């Protein structure tokens, strides 16, 4: 997330340009076009950077670009790569880029809280390049926000990570890959721009926040704990010191960094003392 490639955001110039890219993408998809990961990322690459690579931290489309790189290097679609290399070996049978018809009765809606009417509403709009609300195979397989899963499946992935990339005696990720995913890589200057509340006291690895200063963070935790919050409130963290994995899921727009997830974590740690 130090590349300067950003998500759509109307609060700064590079984000506004990216908003134009995604808005055109939505329009074309609504007209029936199927725009691939490669095509969307090539369009995004023509947008200006928010800053020079490495200058600071800012959440963006890095994971989507990584998905395209995996396709190029493996010669497989991103979905097929993840399925064969991770999901099938881990037994993650409910994780995919869409929900098949036979499982739609288990699929939650995405909700938005209406402050004026004090109630939840189903989200009526697209976000982060996702469309169709996961009910059909997408042409754009988003590495940053494209997967549908369950708490059980997510826990299987987190368990593999906390055991150093090994699942049931079989190594799925190299030791170096696990280190890249679970070790802070930010410089002192970059860390200054990691200013989200849920990332206080943290650095950043490859797609995970990493706790470096427990006294500064919200709640409790040990140095080296890592994890992430999804946009809709999917939360996981691994504590390699106490060997704890926490999974918490809600389906609400802006649910990341939610108060309940931190309270749950605090209660669990207090119970283990």
Show which residues each predicted segment covers.
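Extracellular/periplasmic catalytic domains that process cell-envelope and extracellular macromolecules
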Residues: 200-201, 238-240
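Generic C-terminus detector
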Residues: 251-273
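Short, small/polar residue-rich loop motifs at catalytic or cofactor-binding pockets
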Residues: 230-232
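Short, well-ordered beta-strand elements
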Residues: 236-237, 243-252
